[in-house]
């Protein structure tokens, strides 16, 4: 996928704030601080389009980025952030659920999982939920550059132990924003989904 243009479009917390142009969308989800903003910036070859932060819980809205005037990448608030109040977490959950369940132009979900850790209960719940919605899923194991090469197979077997990867619409990639590992494959997956 060749990126010709990429721009922040809009932030939304409810349906009437979503873009109205019916372009296809790919959503990105994962726990707080898993590297969603870094992945967006790396994929789009932009330094600060999506704001990165060492503070988890920064993204609190659905952030829509218009790519090539053809589709949107949608940055979903990170889940599992302990310092957000129970009420706020519930609001995030409802906002994400409304978006995933009601958005007809949603063509796929990228679930980011930190390759240094076991998938969390929230990661597994999001994966199962996307399966339930029959969404094409790309599981991206982020920060793979922080893992020794000899340990990469261990990361994959740990993932398979925790998540049922025998789903027809799932693809798994390792990824690094530092070394740019599998950036092209990520772009190809997105391109394939938005063209269907």
Swiss-Prot record:
Keyword Cell cycle: yes
Biological processes, Gene Ontology terms: division septum assembly
DNA repair in keyword set: no
Entry cofactors: Mg(2+)
Cellular-component GO terms for this entry: cytosol
Record: residues binding GTP: 30-37, 57-61, 75-78, 142-145, 175-177
Transmembrane segments: none
Keywords of the record: Cell cycle, Cell division, GTP-binding, Magnesium, Metal-binding, Nucleotide-binding, Septation
InterPro entries found in the cross-reference section: G_ENGB_dom, GTP-bd, GTP-bd_ribosome_bio_YsxC, P-loop_NTPase, Small_GTP-bd
Domain (EngB-type G): residue spans on this chain: 22-196
Binding site for Mg(2+): 37, 59
GO molecular function annotations of the record: GTP binding; metal ion binding
Superkingdom of the source species: Bacteria
Gene3D superfamilies, alphabetized: P-loop containing nucleotide triphosphate hydrolases
Family named by the database record: Belongs to the TRAFAC class TrmE-Era-EngA-EngB-Septin-like GTPase superfamily. EngB GTPase family.
Role this protein plays: Necessary for normal cell division and for the maintenance of normal septation.
Record-given protein name: Probable GTP-binding protein EngB
Species classification: Bacteria, Bacillati, Bacillota, Bacilli, Lactobacillales
Gene name tied to this protein: engB
